[in-house]
């Protein structure tokens, strides 16, 4: 819940983490606000900025401010993106734009930071969360157009099916994996 786009706030979070734990081994950027469900024609600049600032800019700042510490520990970064960007989901223009920006930023960081022993990857999850339930209630048309039961027959479990993969991506067994997008959508995220 430290998703901020203010440099001073982000630096304070990083400083507090160092003060508390003495090091940073991993950064996981997974929080973002957006006006999902609002079409491009009806989107306002404030709605668009909400997604870009809370998603793309916050991810950039946390990566940048944590970099010196990640370099020391040869740490890992996992950034969350979305099928909304991969597939151009209806009514999710600002969310998709922010998430695809995060994917681009992640690939650049993988190229720039690989020499420092830092691996940077992307997870695109589909899990039943309070946010997805709120999206269903607030924008039923967009929900119906975009969210379908995965071939796995259930939505992902946040802790078991998403969280465990994130932990592995931050661990020593996956250090060679760098700049990759992992879709955890129960078969919905199949790509060529």
Where do the model's predicted regions map?
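Short C-terminal tail/terminal secondary-structure segment
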Residues: 37, 87, 166-167, 178-192
């Amino acid at each position: 819940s430290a998703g901020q786009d203010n440099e001073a706030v982000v630096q304070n979070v990083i400083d507090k983490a160092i003060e508390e734990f003495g090091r940073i081994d991993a950064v996981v950027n997974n929080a973002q606000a957006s006006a999902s469900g609002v079409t491009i024609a009806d989107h306002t600049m404030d709605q668009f900025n909400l997604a870009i600032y809370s998603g793309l800019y916050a991810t950039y700042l946390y990566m940048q401010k944590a970099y010196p510490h990640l370099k020391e520990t040869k740490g890992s970064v996992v950034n969350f993106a979305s099928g909304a960007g991969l597939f151009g989901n209806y009514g999710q223009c600002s969310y998709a734009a922010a998430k695809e920006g995060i994917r681009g930023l992640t690939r650049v960081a993988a190229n720039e930071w690989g020499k420092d022993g830092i691996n940077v990857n992307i997870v695109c999850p589909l899990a039943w969360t309070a946010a997805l339930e709120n999206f269903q209630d607030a924008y039923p048309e967009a929900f119906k157009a975009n969210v379908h039961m995965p071939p796995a027959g259930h939505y992902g479990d946040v802790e078991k099916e998403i969280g465990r993969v994130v932990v592995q991506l931050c661990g020593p067994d996956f250090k060679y994996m760098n700049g990759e997008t992992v879709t955890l959508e129960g078969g919905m995220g199949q790509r060529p």
